[in-house]
Amino acid sequence: MLAFSLLVLGLLAEVAPASCQQGLGNLQPWMQGLIAVAVFLVLVAIVFAVNHFWCQEEPEPGSTVMIIGNKADGVLVGMDGRYSSMASGFRSSEHKNAYENVLEEEGRVRSTPM
């Protein structure tokens, strides 16, 4: 085995180095830039796709809406027959499905000029 290895090494040392083929020529600078931008955009698209599928959060079971029986309204899981006390302060006395627009105090409202 050692003799075969030395024979191959000797033959490779005696052979003249191969001449590489010359390319068709350098690309124009605008073409190099166009290719670079296209490759960059493809890489960014791949990163966004991986991020979208990898970092997807599962919906919390408490915030999912399910319909039970013939009920027309969606009911939060575990909230059947209960209501939010926060919404009772906004209810209108004119209609059961209407809400009042509560005016905020002037100091608490932040407005910016356009």
UniProtKB/Swiss-Prot annotation:
Matches recorded under Pfam families: MAP17 (PF15807)
Keyword list, A-Z: Cell membrane, Membrane, Phosphoprotein, Transmembrane, Transmembrane helix
UniProt keyword annotation of Cell membrane present: yes
Entry's localization field: Apical cell membrane
Keyword Membrane tagged: yes
Intervals, Extracellular compartment: 1-28
Residues on Cytoplasmic side: 52-114
SUBUNIT field: Forms a heterodimer (via N-terminal transmembrane helix) with SLC5A2/SGLT2 (via TM13); this interaction enhances SLC5A2 transporter activity. Interacts with PDZK1.
Protein name: PDZK1-interacting protein 1
Taxonomy of the source species: Eukaryota, Metazoa, Chordata, Craniata, Vertebrata
Gene: Pdzk1ip1
